[in-house]
């Protein structure tokens, strides 16, 4: 075999090895989760801190931990089998803004802060988020938002409905 033939054979062998390695590597790469079908039918929960100070960020997470289980419990109690849809969750949020505000304000006051709290339901631009195998692309979602104080701090997002 001449020199040119040996080079061609070596190149072919290296290409076959490279393709085999790529195929093997591909089997170890997890598949991307399926995107959520659409932004309707989803109610997000958004808490915005007063500032980026450590205390305000801790307070934001405390408000989340105090209020979210109450909201989830109340929404779940209104759902019955086939009637479980986002309209019920949105209606609950819209009709209970004052109640949700009182819960958040109680927590803020109990922690020794004098910040005001506002609550609203509206459409918000929300960044992409992965929850286990469910992917929510960036976009506009209906959200229940609690803003603490000036609302100039980092925020926190989750999904209220559908329950994850």
Tell where the protein language model's regions lie, with residue ranges.
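Amphipathic, coiled-coil-like alpha-helical scaffolding segments used for oligomerization/assembly
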Residues: 85-128
């Amino acid at each position: 075999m001449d020199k040119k033939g040996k080079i061609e054979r070596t190149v072919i062998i290296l290409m076959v090895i490279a393709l085999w390695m790529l195929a093997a590597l591909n089997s170890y790469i997890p598949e991307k989760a399926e995107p959520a079908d659409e932004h309707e039918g989803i109610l997000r929960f958004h808490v915005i801190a007063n500032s980026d100070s450590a205390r305000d960020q801790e307070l934001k997470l405390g408000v989340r931990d105090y209020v979210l289980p109450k909201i989830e419990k109340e929404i779940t109690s209104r759902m019955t089998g086939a009637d479980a849809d986002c309209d019920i969750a949105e209606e609950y949020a819209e009709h209970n803004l004052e109640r949700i505000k009182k819960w958040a304000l109680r927590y803020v006051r109990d922690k020794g802060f004098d910040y005001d709290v506002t609550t609203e339901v509206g459409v918000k631009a929300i960044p992409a988020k992965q929850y286990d195998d469910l992917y929510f692309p960036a976009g506009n979602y209906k959200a229940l938002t609690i803003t603490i104080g000036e609302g100039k701090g980092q925020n926190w997002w989750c999904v209220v409905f559908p329950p994850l």
